[in-house]
A protein has these predicted regions:
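Feature activates predominantly on carbohydrate-active enzymes
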Residues: 1-103, 107-132, 149, 207-210, ...
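Structured mid-domain segments that build the active-site/substrate or prosthetic-cofactor binding neighborhood
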Residues: 75-81, 89, 197-302, 306
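Conserved, mostly hydrophobic/aromatic
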Residues: 83, 102, 144, 178, ...
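Acidic, His- and aromatic-enriched active-site or binding-groove loops in soluble protein domains
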Residues: 121-139, 173-192, 245, 275-283
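Aromatic-lined carbohydrate-recognition surfaces of secreted/lumenal glycan-active proteins
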Residues: 135-165, 216-226, 253-256
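Substrate-binding cleft/loops of secretory-pathway carbohydrate-active enzymes
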Residues: 155-184, 229-237, 262-270
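Catalytic domains of carbohydrate-active enzymes that cleave complex glycans
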Residues: 276-429
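C-terminal membrane-anchoring or membrane-association module
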Residues: 443-458
């Protein structure tokens, strides 16, 4: 039997399409899943006549800001009335649903409404957007129970960006569910025994939220949104993370990876995390990864296992974080160093040699070759010929595999347009210490030369 009441995963397009078709059935109990403010209070319907319903930012009411959606003014009683009416309608029309989400929109730049009343409530709760949101949710939850006493109805929300921090002096109603996002998070060290500040912060965040609610669903990020194709060795922490969730009585976990074609190790990550959520922390993740690789890569399996072990070992050796928005340069002297990337390339080449002529296995190995080529072509300290060869491999494989997204919000065309400047910038960053030393030496030389000339004149 599964250890989690709610299990979800989004790491491959196939997984996402299956959910849309009703096969994955991940959020079947949810009316909305996330970022739902405007599903209740639409700016198209209300902004022109009631701008006060929407977030204040920079002294103005806004429903969009910096390319993203704004938020709602949750201290406005009329906003509550509109949301309550719509929420009760949805509950009544969807008896098959248990969870009805009301959560902030996805815009880092708009941290809630900044009107005087909203700021006062958030400040009183310890400087968190939950100061306005949680009382709002609790009121909805009480109303839902009163109107539908014979139904199991929960009101859910996201603890995300400005609502991430647990509030002081407020507890949730028994039918409120908090979906806590693993931010800042770190996929290089486990939450069970955090080895750095990012993992420790999320570890402690769970403890603080447990004082507020006993219904937590963790939204866990298992991806580098900045570099969807770079090697991302995070399998080693997953069993301990699962144990941490179980020990803290987490009700559910949703693992989010890349939603686009070709995400790094996406198919294996989908399988391993799905199985882990079902079996629980007693599962031997390392053994399951090896079994998967042996079944999927055939005679090339020993080299593929060697590759995954090498990336994980080199990350551990570097003691670096494995973050959600890591730039490759943060690992140039770690697991993505020139020497390490060349070693990965050698391992993958040996894997191809093992299965030469087996087009199916070669096609599967192509994704690993693509990941290594991507890491290599962004290195600042390789020759032009080697870089061009890596870029040519990358270009061929993304075309063959139909890969169009490099970052969560940046496509292949944009990446290719920026690539020459990225390489130049990377080289300059790598050379900057040397350039600084040369400049200092030149300045010192000029100063000494001027002093000598002055002495001669005197």
């Amino acid at each position: 039997m599964p250890t989690l009441r709610k299990r979800g995963i989004k790491v491959t397009p196939e997984n996402r399409r299956g959910t849309i078709l009703g096969k994955g059935r991940q959020h079947i109990d949810w009316q909305y899943w996330c970022h739902s403010y405007y599903d209740y209070v639409s700016p198209d319907e209300y902004f022109d006549t009631h701008p006060e319903y929407f977030s204040m930012k920079g002294g103005k009411r806004r429903y969009v800001y910096n390319g993203g959606e704004g938020q709602l003014c949750l201290s406005n009683p009329e906003v509550y009335d509109i949301v309550e009416k719509e929420m009760l309608r949805l509950i009544g029309e969807h008896p098959e649903k248990k969870y009805f989400d009301f959560s902030c929109n996805d815009n880092f730049w708009v941290k809630g409404c900044q009107c005087k009343e909203c700021k006062k409530l958030d400040k009183a709760a310890g400087g968190t957007g939950m100061g306005t949101l949680l009382p709002f949710l609790n009121k909805l939850a009480r109303k839902a129970r009163a109107v539908y006493p014979d139904r199991e109805v929960y009101i859910s929300t996201l603890a995300y960006f400005h609502t991430l921090k647990a509030p002081k002096g407020i507890k949730t109603e028994p039918n409120v569910v908090i979906k806590l996002c693993s931010m800042p998070g770190d996929q290089g060290t486990s939450y069970l025994d955090p080895g750095n500040g990012n993992a420790r912060e999320f570890h402690d965040m769970i403890a603080k939220w447990k004082e507020v609610t006993d219904k937590i669903v963790v939204w866990d990020y298992v991806v580098n949104f900045k570099n969807l194709l770079v090697p991302f060795p995070n399998f080693g922490v997953q069993r301990d993370n699962q144990q941490f969730f179980e020990e803290n009585n987490v009700q559910g976990v949703f693992h989010q990876g890349s939603r686009d074609e070709g995400g790094e190790s996406a198919i294996m990550r989908d399988y391993i995390l799905s199985k882990l959520m079902w079996e629980g922390s007693t599962m031997d993740v390392g053994g399951e990864v090896s079994r998967y690789i042996m079944a999927y890569y055939g005679e090339a399996a020993p080299e593929v296992i060697e590759y995954y072990n090498a990336t994980a070992a080199n990350l551990a050796k570097s003691s670096s974080t494995l973050g959600l928005y890591d730039n490759n340069m943060s690992h140039w002297f770690g697991y993505l160093s020139k020497g390490n990337v060349r070693r990965y390339e050698d391992i993958i080449n040996r894997a191809y040699d093992k299965v030469k002529g087996n087009e199916e296995i070669e096609s599967r190995l192509d994704y690993l070759r693509l990941n290594v080529a991507y890491a290599k072509m962004l290195l600042p300290n390789i020759g032009i010929k080697e870089r061009n060869e890596a870029k040519a491999t990358f270009d061929r494989l993304v075309d063959e595999k139909g890969i169009t997204m490099i970052e969560e919000l940046s496509n292949l065309d944009k990446f290719n347009a920026q690539y020459p400047m990225m390489v130049t910038t990377n080289v300059l960053i790598m050379l900057s210490p040397l350039i600084l030393v040369i400049l200092i030496a030149l300045i010192v030389g000029i100063v000494l030369l001027v002093k000598r000339k002055k002495k001669r004149k005197s």
